[in-house]
């Protein structure tokens, strides 16, 4: 009996040492517990789909949404915990990473209700759609906490593969297939460019893959001022540029937006930018800390091109989704200002604040587009003429979201841009902020042009699509309109709650 007790104690002590050595969640506070919730949700989806019939479809939506909400709650419960590095340095947990994870989870939580009625009307496979959304979300969450080059490469590939599959989900649609091919080819090329830049960092640092160790390695090898660092910086910037889709890396964006299912576009338009912004802040701020002047210059050029080209080309668009694609290119130019400012002068805090508002504004706009598309079957901007006469609630919701995207006071977009531009001005980015102000005013023009069409009540200018417009059933008000109402409220009245939002964003800085 004594031997058994000693043997049990030896096994227990050995297990504890083994777990502690590898920083497994059981003994270190469960760093990846939010990610494990999503993995458990994925397993449940597969089990239910393989063992049940069509009557359990609502359970699939319920499990997906519940797992996302529970992951958000898990992140909030461990807020302000000490930063931790786990899995032999591959994964880092801190408030700054977690706030990006919360934003990604929030995007996915709002996007699932947007897809319910759309999937039913188009007869798309439901389980696979939800699996791809949750897996892409999981990849984005791992990307936010990635602390070495291998994880930084694998995590966005997990997100990208699911994005490719989602963009081509309507296999019988020629435009969707074309968009998927362009997305896949350019995504593969950008991943190759990104990993080539990583190989330069790996070699110049003396074989290091952890971000902080790369900095130490560059100092030890005295390669931080070598031409190789500039080459690595250029390749990595181009690779990340595809994920952020600033000009001139934006060619895939309009085609993918136009050809993909609208709920997929809504999902990709926000989650990809949040995940890529998290990646950009870590890559540029840590390994390239000693080359800040060089990457500042590169990002300033990208921001200028994005703001100018995105807003100018958006004026000429006739498709609502293509217009939002070019609008998003301009919006990423504003977000890049926060990345350039960085930790000083509240640059990251202003970027996070504006990104939160951008999620609500953009998803609210897409919710309105999905509703209008399901009821009329069109995406043409001119076909929105006279919508206010048929559905005042939808027209007003779309108008508020568009005005908020344009940055008109007193809506959320105005306060977000004001804070972001002010931080850029304090950091000395005077020319960049002036261009941002001019292009913001320019964007108001094409937003107001759409709003003018919405409010047009003359019968001779109302299109047949609006003339035959039909209101949806009560069920849609529990799904698409639920997300729309939440996003519209978040896009219009957060001005009174700006201080708490900014305080949370500042508290997340590392």
UniProtKB/Swiss-Prot annotation:
Membrane topology: Multi-pass membrane protein
Keyword vocabulary terms for this entry: Chloroplast, Membrane, NAD, NADP, Plastid, Plastoquinone, Quinone, Thylakoid, Translocase, Transmembrane, Transmembrane helix, Transport
GO molecular function: NADH dehydrogenase (ubiquinone) activity; quinone binding
Uppermost EC category: translocase
One GO BP annotation of this record: photosynthesis, light reaction
A GO term from the CC aspect: chloroplast thylakoid membrane
Pfam families: Ndh2_N, Proton_antipo_M
Transmembrane regions: 26-46, 57-77, 99-119, 124-144, 149-169, 184-204, 227-247, 295-315, 323-343, 354-374, 395-415, 418-438, 484-504
Enzyme nomenclature, EC number: 7.1.1.-
Endpoints of the signal sequence: none
Principal place of residence: plastid
Catalytic activity, reaction form: a plastoquinone + NADH + (n+1) H(+)(in) = a plastoquinol + NAD(+) + n H(+)(out); a plastoquinone + NADPH + (n+1) H(+)(in) = a plastoquinol + NADP(+) + n H(+)(out)
Subunit structure: NDH is composed of at least 16 different subunits, 5 of which are encoded in the nucleus.
Family (UniProt): Belongs to the complex I subunit 2 family.
Job of this protein: NDH shuttles electrons from NAD(P)H:plastoquinone, via FMN and iron-sulfur (Fe-S) centers, to quinones in the photosynthetic chain and possibly in a chloroplast respiratory chain. The immediate electron acceptor for the enzyme in this species is believed to be plastoquinone. Couples the redox reaction to proton translocation, and thus conserves the redox energy in a proton gradient.
Designated name of the protein: NAD(P)H-quinone oxidoreductase subunit 2, chloroplastic
Top-level taxonomy: Eukaryota, Viridiplantae, Streptophyta, Embryophyta, Tracheophyta
């Amino acid at each position: 009996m004594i031997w058994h007790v000693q043997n049990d104690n030896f096994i227990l002590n050995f297990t504890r040492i083994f777990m502690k050595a590898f920083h497994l969640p059981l003994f270190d506070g469960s760093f990846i517990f939010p990610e494990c919730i999503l993995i458990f949700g994925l397993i449940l989806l597969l089990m239910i789909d393989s063992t049940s019939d069509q009557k359990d479809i609502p359970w699939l939506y319920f499990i997906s949404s519940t797992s996302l909400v529970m992951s958000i709650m898990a992140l909030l419960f461990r807020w302000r915990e000490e930063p931790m590095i786990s899995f032999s340095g591959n994964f880092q947990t801190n408030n700054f990473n977690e706030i990006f994870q919360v934003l990604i989870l929030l995007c996915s939580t709002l996007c699932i209700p947007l897809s319910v009625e759309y999937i039913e009307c188009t007869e798309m496979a439901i389980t696979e759609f939800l699996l791809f959304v949750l897996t892409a979300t999981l990849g984005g969450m791992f990307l936010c906490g990635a602390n070495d080059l291998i994880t930084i490469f694998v995590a966005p590939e997990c997100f990208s593969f699911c994005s490719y599959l989602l963009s081509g989900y309507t296999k019988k649609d020629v435009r969707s297939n074309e968009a998927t091919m362009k997305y896949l080819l350019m995504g593969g090329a950008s991943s190759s460019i990104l990993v080539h830049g990583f190989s330069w960092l790996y070699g110049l640092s003396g074989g290091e893959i952890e971000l902080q160790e790369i900095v130490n390695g560059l100092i030890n090898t005295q390669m931080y001022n070598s031409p190789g660092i500039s080459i690595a910086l250029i390749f990595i910037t181009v690779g990340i540029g595809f994920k952020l889709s600033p000009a001139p890396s934006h060619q895939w964006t309009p085609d993918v937006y136009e050809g993909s299912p609208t709920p997929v576009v809504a999902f990709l338009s926000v989650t990809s930018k949040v995940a890529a912004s998290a990646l950009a802040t870590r890559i540029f701020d840590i390994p390239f800390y000693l080359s800040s002047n060089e990457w500042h210059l590169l990002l300033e050029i990208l921001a200028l091109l994005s703001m100018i080209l995105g807003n100018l080309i958006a004026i000429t668009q006739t498709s609502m989704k293509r217009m939002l694609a070019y609008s998003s290119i301009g919006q990423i130019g504003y977000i890049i200002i926060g990345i350039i400012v960085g930790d000083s002068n509240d640059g990251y805090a202003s970027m996070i604040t504006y990104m939160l508002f951008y999620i609500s504004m953009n998803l609210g706009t897409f919710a309105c587009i999905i509703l209008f598309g399901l009821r009329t079957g069109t995406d043409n901007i001119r076909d929105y003429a006279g919508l206010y006469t048929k559905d005042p609630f939808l027209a007003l919701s779309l108008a508020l979201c568009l005005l908020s995207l344009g940055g008109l006071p007193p809506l959320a977009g105005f306060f977000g841009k004001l804070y972001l531009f002010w931080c850029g001005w304090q950091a000395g980015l005077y020319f960049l902020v002036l261009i941002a102000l001019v292009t913001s005013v320019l964007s108001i023009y094409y937003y107001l042009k759409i709003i003018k069409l919405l409010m047009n009540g003359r019968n001779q200018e109302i299109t047949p699509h609006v003339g035959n417009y039909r209101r949806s059933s009560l069920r849609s008000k529990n799904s698409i309109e639920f997300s729309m109402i939440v996003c519209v409220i978040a896009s219009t009245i957060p001005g009174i709650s700006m201080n708490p939002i900014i305080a949370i964003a500042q508290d997340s800085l590392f």
